[in-house]
Amino acid sequence: MQPNEITFYQRFEADILAGRKTITIRDKSESHFKAGDILRVGRFEDNQYFCTIEVLSVSPITLDELTEQHAKQENMGLDKLKEVIKTIYPNEHESWIINFKLIG
């Protein structure tokens, strides 16, 4: 069995599978992905594989630079998006947006 290369909280699984969530915002430790990378995706809670994505782009961003468009790509409101990022990465000032598409 192949290992998963990126994980998402289980609460995001349905949105990813439905194509409603098309970006993820990560810290520097996950900024190494490149456009064209094909990634096996697992749930954070149990590492269970649930899909495969293709990375379309990776770019740095600060919390203040986030827009309603980013929030829409995350399938949530902008205030909620900023709150989630602050909760997951409380000490980070710069994050990376990984834009992806579901391929399987």
UniProtKB/Swiss-Prot annotation:
Entries under HAMAP family matching the protein: ac4C_amidohydr
ASCH domain sequence ranges: 6-96
Family in the record: Belongs to the N(4)-acetylcytidine amidohydrolase family.
The enzyme's E.C. designation: 3.5.1.135
Protein name: N(4)-acetylcytidine amidohydrolase
SMART domains, alphabetized: ASCH
Catalytic activity: N(4)-acetylcytidine + H2O = cytidine + acetate + H(+); N(4)-acetyl-2'-deoxycytidine + H2O = 2'-deoxycytidine + acetate + H(+); N(4)-acetylcytosine + H2O = cytosine + acetate + H(+)
GO molecular function: hydrolase activity, acting on carbon-nitrogen (but not peptide) bonds, in linear amidines; N4-acetylcytidine amidohydrolase activity
Gene Ontology, cellular component aspect: cytosol
Active site: K21, T24, E74
Keywords: Hydrolase
Main EC class the enzyme belongs to: hydrolase
Entry-linked InterPro entries: AC4CH (IPR008314), ASCH_domain (IPR007374), PUA-like_sf (IPR015947)
Gene3D superfamilies to which the protein is assigned, alphabetical: Hypothetical protein
Function per UniProt: Catalyzes the hydrolysis of N(4)-acetylcytidine (ac4C).
